[in-house]
């Protein structure tokens, strides 16, 4: 049968996938000449995004991937509010101030009942760390100027396990970064070594409450005690900043007796990520100071914008209000009891996953029981396969499990890491263990990539050696011929 009627040009009668918009390639790096229908734009983008990984199965990330529908609605209701318009959105500003005060008191800031805490909401812990670092640098510079001493070579002491934002701070704001190297079996900053590295130019020592490598808490109390002693001996006043990006919303609920916060006298500022275990979508972070004198007044800007004086201390200006509102929702919705329940569930699911991995008898666990709910583990035997192969094969099941090497002095250690978030259930933990076992079984039936690589390298080395032998032999032959030829020239015909 031959069709004699051509297809209609009326787009309104076509389904989305029958329209011309899915048959043509849109320009990727320049704006198109013509508009396209809204449903076409939506479908085209949605289809491309299907190739992204599933955020719920992204076990590499600490960032929250699930919130209650009521909070989702609040976020959408406030998505068009610019936070800097404080005079126009005074309630949003008030909610931020409430969050700052709740978090400061959660971290045991020495505040009177009616006293207002000093802190600010940020787009994440990276910005929070930049702000805290600037405050330390300015305080140190002011002190050195008053004493008539040089103030052009500030440094900061951290562990080699710090997040890259610390390196950014050091590079962007011209501060020397002095890192305490790690060692096998000890993957966090050693407080004794850190205290030894402190000198009169040290603006602060940064301790991590929840290393990104294995979730371990650094010993902030030990560091505080060592620095108190060193300050007394030297007359310095080296303070501590606690990077509690991951652990700040865990320790108060699970380890209330652990002294890491403003209970320690040298802890002057703390940052925490609301979008990690604060249980809010990216990106919201917080930084709070012990007292007003720990944040130099000259760093605070007073801006007359849209009719109101606005004190501000941020690295940007415009930003959304929705994440601040979402943080306030979680704080009042969950309360202490709710956060405690969530964190206990995370810890229990971490234990289930850890025990399941141990039962395979193929891995060493390098994470600690006390810390952020993370399971970091490495293969006992690397003769045939490695962690990167396991990470790659787990993606076939939908899991995103990162494999990486440790920092300086422990870089020969490779680990896999699973972050246990609120939405990682017991069922998923058991399923992941089963899928890891399947991957191990499959790897056992496959030829070793490592052996193959070594074999290829060995063959290449043999070829190289043979090539060198031939080259040497040819050089000898050419040299001998040249020698004989020269002899003939000198002696004539024999």
From Swiss-Prot:
Homohexamer. Interacts with calmodulin. Up-regulated by calmodulin binding at physiological pH. Its cofactor is pyridoxal 5'-phosphate. It comes from Arabidopsis thaliana (Mouse-ear cress). Its EC number is 4.1.1.15. Transmembrane segments: none annotated. This is Glutamate decarboxylase 2. Expressed in roots, inflorescence stems, flowers, siliques and leaves. GO terms for molecular function: calmodulin binding; glutamate decarboxylase activity; pyridoxal phosphate binding. GO terms for biological process: glutamate metabolic process. InterPro entries: Glutamate_decarboxylase (IPR010107), PyrdxlP-dep_de-COase (IPR002129), PyrdxlP-dep_Trfase (IPR015424), PyrdxlP-dep_Trfase_major (IPR015421). The record marks 488-489 as: Anchoring site for calmodulin binding. Belongs to the group II decarboxylase family. GO terms for cellular component: cytosol; nucleus. Induction: Up-regulated by salt treatment. Up-regulated by nitrogen treatments such as ammonium chloride, ammonium nitrate, glutamate and glutamine but not by potassium nitrate. Down-regulated by hypoxia. Catalyzes the conversion of glutamate to 4-aminobutanoate (GABA). The calmodulin-binding is calcium-dependent and it is proposed to directly or indirectly form a calcium regulated control of GABA biosynthesis. Disruption phenotype: No visible phenotype. It catalyses: L-glutamate + H(+) = 4-aminobutanoate + CO2. Keywords: Calmodulin-binding, Decarboxylase, Lyase, Pyridoxal phosphate. The C-terminus (463-494) binds calmodulin in a calcium-dependent fashion.
């Amino acid at each position: 049968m031959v069709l004699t009627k051509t297809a209609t040009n009326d787009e309104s009668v076509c389904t989305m996938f029958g329209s011309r918009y899915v048959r043509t390639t849109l320009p990727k790096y320049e704006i198109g000449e013509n508009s396209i229908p809204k449903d076409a734009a939506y479908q085209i983008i949605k289809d491309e995004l299907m190739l992204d990984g599933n955020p719920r199965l992204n076990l590499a990330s600490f960032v929250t991937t699930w919130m209650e529908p009521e909070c989702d609605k609040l976020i959408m209701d406030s998505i068009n509010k610019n936070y800097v318009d404080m005079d126009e959105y005074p309630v949003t500003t008030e909610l931020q101030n409430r969050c700052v005060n709740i978090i400061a008191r959660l971290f045991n800031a020495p505040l009177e009942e009616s006293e207002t805490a000093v802190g600010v909401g940020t787009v994440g812990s990276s910005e929070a760390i930049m702000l805290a670092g600037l405050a330390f640098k300015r305080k140190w510079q002011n002190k050195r100027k008053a004493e008539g001493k040089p103030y052009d070579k500030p440094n900061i002491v951290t562990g080699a396990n710090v997040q890259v934002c610390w390196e950014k701070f050091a590079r962007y704001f011209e501060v020397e970064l002095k890192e305490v190297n790690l060692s096998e079996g000890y993957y966090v900053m050693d407080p004794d070594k850190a205290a030894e590295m402190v000198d009169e130019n040290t603006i602060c020592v940064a301790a991590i409450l929840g290393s990104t490598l294995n979730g371990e808490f650094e010993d902030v109390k030990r560091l505080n005690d060592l620095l108190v002693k060193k300050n007394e001996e030297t007359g310095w006043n080296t303070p501590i900043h606690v990077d509690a990006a991951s652990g700040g919303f865990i320790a108060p609920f699970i380890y209330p007796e652990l002294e890491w916060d403003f209970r320690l006298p040298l802890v002057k500022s703390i940052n925490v990520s609301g979008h990690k275990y604060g249980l809010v979508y990216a990106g919201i972070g917080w930084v709070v100071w012990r007292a007003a004198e720990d944040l130099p007044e000259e760093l605070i800007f007073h801006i007359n914008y849209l009719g109101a004086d606005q004190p501000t201390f941020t690295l940007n200006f415009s930003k959304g209000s929705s994440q601040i509102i979402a943080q306030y929702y979680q704080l009042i919705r969950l309360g202490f009891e709710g956060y405690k329940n969530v964190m206990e569930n995370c810890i229990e699911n971490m234990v289930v996953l850890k025990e399941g991995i141990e039962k395979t008898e193929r891995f060493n666990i390098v994470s600690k029981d006390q810390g952020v709910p993370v399971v970091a583990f490495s293969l006992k035997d690397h003769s045939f396969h490695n962690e990167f192969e396991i990470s790659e094969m787990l993606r076939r099941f939908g899991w995103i499990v990162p494999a990486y090497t440790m920092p300086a002095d422990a870089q020969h250690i490779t680990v896999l890491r699973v972050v246990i978030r609120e939405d990682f259930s017991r069922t998923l933990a058991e399923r992941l263990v089963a899928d890891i076992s399947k991957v191990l079984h499959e790897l056992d039936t496959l030829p070793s990539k490592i052996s193959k690589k070594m074999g290829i390298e060995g063959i290449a080395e043999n070829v190289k050696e043979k090539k060198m032998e031939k080259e040497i032999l040819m050089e000898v032959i050419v040299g001998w011929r040249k020698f004989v030829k020269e002899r003939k020239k000198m002696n004539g015909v024999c």
